From Swiss-Prot:
The keyword rRNA-binding applies. Belongs to the universal ribosomal protein uS14 family. This is Small ribosomal subunit protein uS14c. It comes from the Eukaryota. InterPro entries: Ribosomal_uS14, Ribosomal_uS14_bac/plastid, Ribosomal_uS14_CS. NCBIfam families: PRK08881.1. One of its GO terms (molecular function) is rRNA binding. GO terms for cellular component: chloroplast; small ribosomal subunit. Binds 16S rRNA, required for the assembly of 30S particles. GO terms for biological process: translation. Part of the 30S ribosomal subunit. It is found in: Plastid, Chloroplast.
Length: 100
């Protein structure tokens, strides 16, 4: 089980990414469109003034049950441990053990 502080930190980052997504996208589009160097510098400064944690690449996928950051299956939103436990308990519809 991951520390609660790490899970909470990740959820705050996700909220910041969602909050600033449209503004960040608009600034990036404006930077691409502008031709003057001075205006581009001003727009880049505005982009840099946004919070650091509002960048989508700082998000990390975590298991919804345990908060484990590694061994994450994005189709289910679970770590490999919880995926295996839930599959054995028949809690995931359509998931069966492989047999050949």
């Amino acid at each position: 089980m991951a520390k609660k502080s790490m899970i909470e930190r990740e959820s705050k980052r996700a909220a910041l990414v969602a909050k600033y997504a449209t503004r960040r996208q608009a600034l990036k589009a404006a930077i691409q469109k502008t031709k003057s160097f001075d205006e581009r510098l001003v727009l880049q400064h505005q982009l840099q003034d946004l919070p650091v944690n509002s960048v989508p690449c700082r998000l990390h996928n975590r298991c919804t049950i345990t908060g484990r950051p590694k061994g994450y299956y994005r189709d289910f939103g679970l770590s490999r441990h919880e995926l295996r436990a839930m599959a054995h308990g028949c809690l995931l519809p359509g998931v069966t053990k492989a047999s050949w």
